[in-house]
Design a protein with these regions (language model features):
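Short, glycine-rich, amphipathic interfacial segments at transmembrane boundaries or analogous
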Residues: 101-151, 209-228
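A short, structured surface patch at a secondary-structure boundary
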Residues: 139-205, 244-252
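Juxtamembrane loop-helix boundary motifs flanking transmembrane segments in multi-pass membrane proteins
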Residues: 18-22, 26, 56-64, 147, ...
Length: 259
């Protein structure tokens, strides 16, 4: 009735201007009122059935502080690691044919894909060989491990053991695709296998290091890793990032759990 009443002034003006138009105006107003009323009703039902929106994982201040730490840490690390990066690039070229860098699509915050950069640690056609080494269609979980992967080069094995292959990811951190600390960035085809709970780990930027890396690295099961990462997200604090960064140093130097 309210929608119908709101159209009465228009109907009166139409009648005064043209009686012929005025005769059909009530039917037009009735149709208008019905459409508006139906739309309002559906909208109210959808509103009432909506679950409360989740609060952002990180508050604005936390996001700002984390981003400032990422920018400062990545920039200083890139400068400090420049001589080592040049030596690694030379070693890769001398060890095997192919490019120095390996670029692959990974899934970032909120499911957005980005191009992750690493030093190449495998033979050039490693992606094509993967299907010959593991039946991807039969995976019970969205994760796989290949100990003693034959695709890894000699230099690549050394780089992986001490996570030196991940140094170029500092560029991803500067670009805003990654963070210094966060969940592990996963491949797109693995994320397609995620259920709703597993997708919760995409609520923040993936990290160069994270709770997985300082609590067992590749020796963890996917369930253990997921639990650690979700706990990190749900109880985020900047000091936890600092603690993880400090713990990463001895973990990397020991070289355990990296495949």
């Amino acid at each position: 009735l309210a929608f119908l009443a709101s159209g009465l002034p228009f109907g009166w003006k139409a009648w005064r201007k043209d009686h012929a138009v005025g005769l059909v105006t009530p039917f037009m107003l009735a149709a208008r009122a019905l459409a508006l009323g139906a739309g309002y009703g559906v909208g109210m039902l959808r509103f009432l059935n909506l679950e409360p929106q989740e609060r952002p994982v990180l508050k604005a201040r936390q996001r700002l502080m984390k981003r400032l730490m990422d920018l400062a840490g990545a920039l200083l690390s890139l400068i400090a690691a420049a001589p080592l990066s040049l030596a690694i690039a030379l070693a890769i070229k001398l060890d095997s044919s192919g490019p120095v860098l390996y670029v692959q699509d990974r899934v970032g915050v909120n499911g957005r894909t980005f191009r992750m950069i690493k030093f190449r640690t495998m033979v050039p056609d490693a992606d094509k060989q993967l299907g010959e080494l593991i039946d991807l269609a039969s995976l019970e979980e969205p994760v796989f491990k290949l100990k003693g992967d034959p695709r890894v080069t000699r230099v690549g094995g050394f780089l992986r053991r001490f996570s030196l292959d991940e140094l170029p990811q500092l560029i991803n951190v500067l670009a805003g695709d990654m963070s210094l600390v966060g969940p592990r960035p996963e491949e797109t085809w693995l994320v397609r296998l995620y259920n709703d709970q597993q997708r919760r780990r995409l609520a923040v930027r993936p990290g160069m290091t994270g709770p997985m890396q300082v609590n067992g690295r590749g020796d963890l099961t996917f369930a253990q890793r997921l639990q650690l990462e979700l706990d990190y997200i749900e109880h985020y604090a900047l000091r936890r990032d600092l603690v993880i960064l400090l713990k990463t140093i001895p973990v990397v130097l020991r070289g355990r759990g990296a495949y």
